[in-house]
Swiss-Prot record:
Expressed asymmetrically in the QL neuroblast. Transcription factor that binds to the promoter region of the transcription factor lin-39 to repress its expression in Q neuroblasts and thereby direct left Q neuroblast (QL) daughter cell migration. During postembryonic development, required for posterior-specific pattern formation. Within the posterior body region, controls epidermal, neuronal, and mesodermal cell differentiation. Keywords: Developmental protein, DNA-binding, Homeobox, Nucleus, Repressor, Transcription, Transcription regulation. It is found in: Nucleus. This is Homeobox protein mab-5. It comes from the Eukaryota. GO terms for cellular component: nucleoplasm; nucleus; RNA polymerase II transcription regulator complex. Residues 115-175 bind DNA. Disruption phenotype: Defective QL neuroblast daughter cell migration. Lin-39 and mab-5 double mutants have reduced sex myoblast specific expression of sem-2 in the developing mesoderm. It comes from Caenorhabditis elegans. Residues 184-194 have a biased composition (Acidic residues).
Amino acid sequence: MSMYPGWTGDDSYWAGAGTTASSQSASSGTSASASSSAAAAAAANNLKTYELYNHTYMNNMKHMLAAGWMDNSSNPFAYNPLQATSANFGETRTSMPAISQPVFPWMKMGGAKGGESKRTRQTYSRSQTLELEKEFHYHKYLTRKRRQEISETLHLTERQVKIWFQNRRMKHKKEAKGEGGSNESDEESNQDEQNEQHSS
């Protein structure tokens, strides 16, 4: 089976290139008028060969699209040879029938569960970050009631506030460790574990 399902296998393109070279070498010994007519015939032959090659190429591209090997719908800026050369044949991409392509399980996004999509990273606005940092400056740990208040004020979920504080405490711990406060960070990690058990 061929790699390209619609490939016709005709060698007319390569045969046309050979006849052009032989017609040019034969015309080199004749008069100027014969040479110009031979050149015109060679040019016409080259044009026919090009059109045949282009037509065959376009058919192969259509078959590849039909087989689902090429799909530019995910990238609208990708080069599409059908759009680039279809002006020669009076065709457009929209005139082709819509082809439904099969979606195999390995093509789907993999998550922990079948229908679960990967969670995106939460970005906080400057005002949200400022308020969270301000609260962290005064209180490294939040009570459930305070976490609810902050989440309502900043339009975040309680889970987002909780995770932000966990991450901020880890950052604070790393910063303290970098300054040489290893004893403080050990005490803080024990306190982190105790407070997490009480606040959850």
